[in-house]
From Swiss-Prot:
Pathway(s): Lipid metabolism; malonyl-CoA biosynthesis; malonyl-CoA from acetyl-CoA: step 1/1
Organism, scientific name: Methylobacterium nodulans (strain LMG 21967 / CNCM I-2342 / ORS 2060)
Protein name listed in UniProt: Acetyl-coenzyme A carboxylase carboxyl transferase subunit beta
Domain of life: Bacteria
EC identifiers of the protein: 2.1.3.15
Top-level EC class: transferase
Coiled-coil zones: none
């Protein structure tokens, strides 16, 4: 009898007491800094545009968060994006591609890795395209290529600057050659912006790599980057394994690339909006009219 009583106390009463006094704590209440290990209350991080106070480490942002941060009053018009065939290659690795797409859409609430918005930034009409790394690593596929081109067409139609926030691991392997085709297609779209004399600015965020770096991310009139962003074609680990040498400290980080002339400026996230508005304002000014050549008067005989 005594044994049964003890079992009842240990198996039934104690767990109920623990549950009664247990305080529910959401898993995402605190954010850990990847650099210092510092724990920061999530509301502080959100209020600081997802930059860790103290270490100034720039966390990744969703496309929605990025657009809200950039546009005046946090309001903009979503640009409708074209629909593309889903999984035309019927690709499967460990998992079917269509299932990977379903999971990514459920996780992010997006149809693919790109969002395009039109609105005002610092009072200037502007078209912004944002890649979301949370959607299959921001990989470039048919949908992303179509979205980039539609953003460029919107900028052409409305005569606005086109600003891209790049965040990608590269081309989407599940779409094979159809993914690689987006590299020349996006390059042609950038060329059309150049011909129309409209500014195209690229902001490289962490990470910007692979086929995205080999195409539209490196074709801007001005290249900006967030602090500490990884930027390159192949990652540093792959390069080290290939050349069998240790890479320099900070190799492929935005500060290193700035020192070596690959990008124009490293800009803290809090200064991005003002910097982009200022640059676009300068670039959109019409060139001064050249003075008309006066017809030479005939010399007296």
């Amino acid at each position: 009898m005594k044994v049964e009583t003890m079992n009842w106390i240990s198996e039934v009463v104690r767990p109920r007491i623990k549950t009664l006094f247990k305080r529910e704590t959401p898993e995402n209440l605190w954010v850990k800094c990847p650099e210092t290990g510092q724990m920061v209350f999530h509301k502080e991080v959100e209020a600081n545009d997802y930059v860790i106070p103290g270490s100034e480490h720039h966390l990744r942002m969703t496309a929605q968060q990025r657009l809200k941060m950039m546009f005046d009053q946090g309001t903009w018009l979503d640009v409708p994006l074209p629909e593309v065939p889903v999984d035309p290659l019927k690709f499967r690795d460990e998992k079917r591609y269509v299932d990977r797409l379903k999971d990514a859409r459920a996780k992010t609430g997006m149809m693919d890795a790109f969002k395009v918005g039109f609105g005002r930034v610092g009072g200037l009409p502007m078209t912004l395209a944002v890649q979301d790394f949370g959607f299959m690593g921001g990989s470039l596929g048919m949908a992303a290529g179509e979205a980039f081109v539609r953003g460029a067409e919107t900028a052409l139609d409305k005569r606005t600057p086109y600003v891209l926030f790049a965040a990608s691991g590269g081309a989407r392997m599940q779409e094979g050659i159809l993914s690689l085709m987006q590299m020349p297609r996006t390059t042609v779209a950038v060329r059309r912006l150049n011909q129309a004399r409209l500014p195209y600015l690229v902001v490289m965020t962490n990470p910007t790599t692979g086929g995205v770096t080999a195409s539209y991310a490196m074709l801007g009139d001005i290249h900006l980057a967030e602090p500490g962003a990884l930027i390159g074609f192949a990652g540093p680990r792959v390069i080290e394994q290939t050349i069998r040498e240790k890479l320099p400290d900070g190799f492929q980080r935005s500060e290193y690339l700035r020192e070596h002339g690959m990008i124009d400026q490293v800009v803290h996230r809090r200064d991005l909006k003002a910097t982009i508005a200022r640059l676009c304002g300068l670039l959109m000014q019409a060139p001064a009219a050249e003075p008309a050549e006066e017809e030479a008067e005939p010399l007296p005989a």
